[in-house]
Amino acid sequence: MIPVSLTSQLANAADTEINRILRIGATACKQSKPTGEVGFVAAFVLGAVPAIAAAWRPILSPAGYSVSMTGIFCHQTPRATFTNSAGLTKSCELSDLLVVVDDMTSGVPTSRWAVLIQAKMAASHGGQSLSGAGDLTQLDLMTHWPAFSLPSTFPPGARNFSTCSYSGTNLDCGRYGLIEPQPTPLWHQQAPAPKMPAGGDELGTFLAKMLESGQTGYGREATGRFDDWSRTVDDLMNVTAKTAFTYSAGLKGPHPRGNTAIALVVCNPSGSDFTNGYWM
């Protein structure tokens, strides 16, 4: 996607905007200061996605690059049903957030990277340990990614991320986002584990590294439509992103679950429309 020489600038710009939005909320949507993980995810989708695109534009434009970013509020929608490592049928949300970046440099999307993120408030020391039954079910899903199904509003059939042949591993498809409380709600990314340490890449840095050409470990490529990872990302953009959510704690709704912003406005010479990451 983007040369590594631009990563530092993109990371600093994204971290600055995310930190600002998490402190104050998505004020353009009349969100008050968020205090819990759901509110922080909403602030990212509604406020940080367009703010990052605006901050990246003067970095990418002179170099001739263009990317689009989509954030999708997935909290409780959809839920995944799977057989856990103990052989029991379990159900939990697929994640709290999906972030997708598309390379739009040529005017049409040529490559796509995505990551599912489960948000958790960090403990006082900055890390987090998972021990509750619900948390362990979610961890089992994100650690092993067994075959799972989604509700009837999605195309039928089991989904198995092992069908993805792109570089990286199934573990790269998901990360935990550990968010520190106000007044400095820093958001750090951690690989799924029962005990996650403090620190790690800030979310903006993680997203900037997703754009690096040839990288692994920061999300996973989802360019195709024939493997279950790419298909699931596409389905979330076509189904979940088109629905609305309400959140009573400081955010009047409803609001769209999906929000897309382009870091460099490009002209499509064919005159067709850009819809959910694809020219139609």
Residue ranges and their predicted role:
Residues 84-90:
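Short, solvent-exposed beta-strand/turn "edge" segments of beta-rich domains on protein surfaces
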